[in-house]
């Protein structure tokens, strides 16, 4: 049976202005992971997002038919509404962005993370420490946490999020940051260790120009809303959910 993906639980974030927007081929996740994003709270309506191609039409006299082709692509205008939160840092940033001509990075985080996967593991005391988890299926950069009935080796702390590096079919090491250096373990350990993935939902990144920051009114029983329309000015990068069972 088909799976529905509700909008409920999604969040929208805005970053600081940029001077240049990369070409489509250069839109990669690392451009955005270093950005300090601020959530725009009170999101009431999510606008459309994604490419649409322009239509090229030429009327051919001899055939009596129009020929059509796809032209340039446009990621559209995202027409968002927010309940008014005057002291919200994200709404303040959105309103300030409308007053400029700059492009801003945006992040959409959806609430569709898969269930976490858990397994007992063994950990070597070595440089780097190696975690053994048979057929773990984890990828580099995937997030995991550890728990134990005893003591983890020095270098690892229970409940802290680590990131997979150097994965093989049945083993991997971890780093303190995505793509960081593998952690060396030392000392002694005891008990049974458990690794649990830290799943993330779908994330979309893009650059956009904030075109409006208007207040919408209505009748007496209508709440005032902040209308924040964003002209998407780049390709939209979609990062699929990771870290689930």
Regions found by a protein language model. Give the residues of each.
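Small/polar beta-strand repeat architecture
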Residues: 116-203
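Generic short beta-strand segments
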Residues: 83-85, 109-111, 145-150, 209-213
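Predominantly extracellular/luminal cell-surface or secreted proteins
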Residues: 13-25, 107-111, 145-149, 163, ...
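Charged, amphipathic alpha-helical segments and their flanking helix caps
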Residues: 1, 10, 22-37, 91, ...
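Structured, beta-strand-rich domain cores
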Residues: 63-113
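Solvent-exposed edge beta-strands and adjacent loop segments
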Residues: 2-84, 202-203, 207-224
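Surface-exposed ligand/attachment interfaces on beta-rich extracellular proteins
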Residues: 32-36, 52-71, 87-92, 121-136, ...
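Short beta-strand and beta-hairpin "edge-sheet" elements
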Residues: 109-116, 198-239
């Amino acid at each position: 049976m088909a799976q529905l993906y509700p909008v409920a639980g999604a969040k929208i974030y805005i970053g600081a202005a940029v001077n240049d927007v990369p070409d489509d081929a250069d839109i990669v996740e690392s451009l955005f992971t270093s950005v300090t994003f601020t959530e725009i709270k009170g999101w009431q309506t999510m606008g459309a997002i994604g490419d649409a191609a322009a239509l090229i039409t030429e009327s051919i006299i001899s055939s009596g038919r129009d020929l059509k082709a796809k032209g340039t692509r446009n990621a559209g205008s995202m027409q968002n509404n927010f309940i008014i939160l005057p002291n919200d840092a994200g709404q303040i940033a959105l309103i300030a962005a409308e007053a400029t001509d700059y492009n801003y990075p945006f992040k959409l985080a959806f609430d569709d993370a898969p269930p976490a996967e858990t397994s007992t593991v063994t950990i070597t005391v070595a440089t780097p420490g190696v975690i053994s988890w048979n057929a773990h299926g984890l990828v580099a950069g995937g997030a995991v946490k550890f728990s134990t009935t005893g003591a983890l080796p020095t270098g690892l702390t229970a409940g802290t999020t680590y990131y997979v590096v150097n994965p093989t079919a049945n083993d991997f090491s971890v780093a303190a940051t995505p793509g960081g250096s593998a952690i060396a373990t030392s000392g002694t350990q005891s008990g049974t260790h458990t690794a649990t993935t830290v799943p993330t939902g779908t994330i979309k990144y893009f650059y956009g120009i904030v075109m409006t920051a208007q207040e919408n009114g209505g009748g007496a029983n209508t709440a005032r809303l902040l209308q924040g329309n964003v002209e998407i000015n780049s390709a939209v990068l979609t990062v699929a959910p990771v870290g689930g069972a």
